[in-house]
């Protein structure tokens, strides 16, 4: 009995010291999360993980392709300074209605009416169209807003034709900031808001301009000489009263959105075709020297 009780501490390892090499190994080892293997998860689960990783890489390639080009959607060719002039985009309001933040965009004054610099308008309009096309390419929700009754029918038809949304009626304050309380927790806010008119009347800014700035929603807006461009992410100085100018804006935005959605379909089809021809290839998606922005 004494012998068994004396052997019991040796069996349990009481008083035993770990070798020094194991202590050094434990001190240098850094724990990291173990990656599940096929043996632990099974072949079906491992196949699902591989398919999800492949789909993620596929989507990343599609989304990153337009970022490799400065003008992937060729929006620069949609208009010219001459076309802006013919649509009377350069005509502003009287000098007495001028907003002080619009002075950098004014070329001069003629017969007490401000004249907008069309060179700056062309630059800002190209940036706005390019951003809108990128948003449509990434399947974002685009909302057109205007309070001008004269162009309500035109804007609603344009938004419907390009597969987007429009709001041309009275805009209730808090529809963006309190959207979860008004419409439920599953509501999705627009990814981009385009203001074809940023004023409710000649002096009152649209309520959605302020709410979009509070919710960090990017905005594109046509700002006349009596508008405040500070809260607009991509302001486009131009006439927002002439029917020719508003028709031009609608045509340009509709063309940019439609072209971006068509490019998305073409790029997806091209990558799927290349994936079928070269399975498992992680190289460049298109041959060196090929410019997809002009080939699609």
Swiss-Prot record:
What is an annotated GO biological process for this record, any one? Answer: mitochondrial ribosome assembly
Q: Where this protein primarily resides, as one coarse class?
A: mitochondrion
- Chloroplast in keyword set: no
Q: Which GO terms describe its molecular function?
A: structural constituent of ribosome
Which InterPro entries does the UniProt entry name for this protein?
Answer: Ribosomal_uS2, Ribosomal_uS2_bac/mit/plastid, Ribosomal_uS2_CS, Ribosomal_uS2_flav_dom_sf
What cellular-component terms does GO give this entry? mitochondrial inner membrane; mitochondrial matrix; mitochondrial small ribosomal subunit; mitochondrion
Keywords, in A-Z order? Disease variant, Mitochondrion, Primary mitochondrial disease, Ribonucleoprotein, Ribosomal protein
Segment Disordered: which positions? 274-296
Give compartment(s).
Answer: Mitochondrion
Q: Which domain of life is it from?
A: Eukaryota
Q: How does it assemble?
A: Component of the mitochondrial small ribosomal subunit (mt-SSU). Mature mammalian 55S mitochondrial ribosomes consist of a small (28S) and a large (39S) subunit. The 28S small subunit contains a 12S ribosomal RNA (12S mt-rRNA) and 30 different proteins. The 39S large subunit contains a 16S rRNA (16S mt-rRNA), a copy of mitochondrial valine transfer RNA (mt-tRNA(Val)), which plays an integral structural role, and 52 different proteins.
Quote the HAMAP family the UniProt record gives: Ribosomal_uS2_B
Family the UniProt entry places it in: Belongs to the universal ribosomal protein uS2 family.
Q: Which disease does the UniProt record connect it to? A: Combined oxidative phosphorylation deficiency 36: An autosomal recessive, multisystem disease resulting from deficiencies of mitochondrial respiratory enzyme complexes and mitochondrial dysfunction. Clinical manifestations include sensorineural hearing impairment, mild developmental delay, hypoglycemia, and intellectual disability.
This chain's function reads:
Required for mitoribosome formation and stability, and mitochondrial translation.
Name the record gives this protein: Small ribosomal subunit protein uS2m
Protein source organism: Homo sapiens
Q: Which gene encodes it?
A: MRPS2
């Amino acid at each position: 009995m004494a012998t068994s009780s004396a052997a019991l501490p040796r069996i349990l390892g009481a008083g035993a010291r770990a070798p020094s090499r194991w202590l050094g190994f434990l001190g240098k080892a850094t724990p990291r999360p173990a990656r599940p293997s096929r043996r632990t998860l099974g072949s079906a689960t491992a196949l699902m993980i591989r398919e999800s990783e492949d789909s993620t890489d596929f989507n990343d390639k599609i989304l990153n392709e337009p970022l490799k080009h400065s003008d992937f959607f060729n929006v620069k060719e949609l208009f010219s300074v001459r076309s802006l002039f013919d649509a009377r985009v350069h005509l502003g309001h009287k000098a007495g209605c001028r907003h002080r933040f619009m002075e950098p965009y004014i070329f001069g004054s003629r017969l007490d009416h401000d004249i907008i610099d069309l060179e700056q308008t062309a630059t800002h309009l190209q940036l706005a169209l390019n951003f809108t096309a990128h948003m449509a390419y990434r399947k974002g929700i685009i909302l057109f807003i205007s309070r001008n009754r004269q162009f309500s029918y035109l804007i609603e038809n344009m938004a419907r034709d390009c597969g987007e949304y429009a709001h041309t009626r009275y805009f209730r304050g808090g529809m963006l900031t309190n959207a979860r309380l008004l419409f439920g927790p599953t509501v999705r806010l627009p990814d981009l808001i385009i203001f074809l008119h940023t004023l409710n009347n000649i002096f009152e800014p649209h309520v959605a301009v302020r709410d979009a700035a509070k919710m960090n929603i990017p905005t594109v807006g046509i700002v006349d000489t009596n508008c405040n461009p500070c809260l607009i992410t991509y302001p486009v100085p131009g006439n927002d009263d002439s029917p020719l100018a508003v028709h031009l804006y609608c045509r340009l935005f509709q063309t940019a959105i439609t072209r971006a959605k068509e490019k998305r379909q073409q790029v997806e089809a091209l990558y799927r075709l290349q994936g079928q021809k070269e399975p498992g290839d992680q190289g460049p998606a298109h041959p060196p020297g090929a410019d997809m922005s002009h080939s699609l």
